Curated annotation (Swiss-Prot):
InterPro entries: Glyco_trans_1 (IPR001296), GS/SS (IPR011835), Starch_synth_cat_dom (IPR013534)
Catalytic reaction equation(s): [(1->4)-alpha-D-glucosyl](n) + ADP-alpha-D-glucose = [(1->4)-alpha-D-glucosyl](n+1) + ADP + H(+)
Protein name: Glycogen synthase
Binding residue positions for ADP-alpha-D-glucose: 20
Family of this protein: Belongs to the glycosyltransferase 1 family. Bacterial/plant glycogen synthase subfamily.
Function: Synthesizes alpha-1,4-glucan chains using ADP-glucose.
Lineage: Bacteria, Pseudomonadati, Chlorobiota, Chlorobiia, Chlorobiales
Superkingdom field: Bacteria
Keyword Transferase among record annotations: yes
Pfam families (alphabetical): Glyco_transf_5, Glycos_transf_1
Biological processes per GO annotation: glycogen biosynthetic process
Gene behind this protein: glgA
Organism: Chlorobaculum tepidum (strain ATCC 49652 / DSM 12025 / NBRC 103806 / TLS) (Chlorobium tepidum)
Amino acid sequence: MARRNFKVLYVSGESSPFVRVSSLADYMASFPQALEEEGFEARIMMPKYGIINDRKFRLHDVLRLSDIEVPLKDKTDMLHIKVTALPSSKIQTYFLYNEKYFKRYGLFSDISLGGDHKGSAERIIFFSVGVMETLVRLGWQPDIIHCHDWHAGLVALLAKTRYAKHDFFKKVKVVQTIHNVYRQGVFPSKAFQKHLDPEVCDALDMEGGEVNLLATGIKHADLVTTTSDRYARQLLDDPELSFGMDKALKACGDRFHGILNGMDTRQWNPSSDKLIKKRYSAEQPEMKLEDKKVLLEEVGLPFSEETPVVGVIGSFDQYQGAEIVKASLAKLLELDIQLIVFGSGDKEFDQALKETAEENEEKMAFRPEFTDAFYHQMIAGLDILLMTSRIEACGMMQMFAMNYGTVPVAYAGGGIVDTIEEVSGDKGTGFIFTDYTPEALTAKLQEALALFANRERWSALMLECMGRDFSWSTSAGQYAELYRNLLG
């Protein structure tokens, strides 16, 4: 008898190319496809933020998925679904939309991130209940609901409480994956008590009048995973690194697993990438120089083959390198490099970077606005990718970079060291600094620059990077085994 294809729903707050804030978006763009190749039927649900361009991504309405009722404790709101396929795949991606909750707003935010989180608790409640109601209307019955980060923690709880009695969800299993442990979805409990029944509220992870949605997802999931085995061990052993999640994770026992990220080697392939100007391969690495020229022209910096171009990419907050980038700028600009910073932080960070770039217009460029096309062009055109996150569960950007012959210089946080082999003699793929200080960062970058000056050795390093296998093949197989064991 042929084995039935199990159905897996992936719930996330972001996914490339539709909207990107963190590496979670890159993960969502490739991981479901890898699991389809393992014999699972995958679909995705995420919010339809107002910033997502319907025309660009070919989102279309589905008549039978319009006017879905989302029953809350104190009211019933209406939900509308738009759908498209994940690019280069047949994976259906469903966008949950309500004008009041999503038209004028960006991504979800919470207390821990500061900024404007007003209304986010109500939005996440609406989205989470909406996911469950959409599945019922759709008639697509998942075997597993795979929840990603705090954005989907409430979905895990709803599946195990309010909807557990529903015939449609009686057999469903829940997996919760941690990508960003310091982003935990912390909110005052008031909105949850207002909009959710006592049965659900009583099961929330709550302390001091605040709800923690990541902890809620961990508590109620059948399996909990994170994006590298090393990072999983660190979360269990280091309360500071886990931001207080170590107790919840220890309580999981053998339900907690670390599986290394992979990458989509079709989407991120310099020989076939449609988003870069000049394609190249390990057989023609010299063509990468053309992408360097294009990148520098795009940001308004002069081209020199001998001057290394160093890039920093991120959503810069206190854990993703905002402070160390600002503190290192003066020293970095003393080096014989050109520097491109791509991504934004708070207003103070953006203003400081903008002013520094204007004062050093021959050496530095700052691009705060994210576009997928520039992201690819930057990965292709850089000589060195400088990774400044203090906490990185695994990351995928260093994998993209190495696949394009761009050498990473990274802080040894989380699972980074599972994917970058420190350069030693003729071996290795990158440079890792272990002290999170501007001095250590600059010193390690200078090691890379010294090697860059030796063109023969640098070319060999580029080829070593491009020869590594970062595909999902191994990791997807590990997830497939977890899924099948969970389903019995």
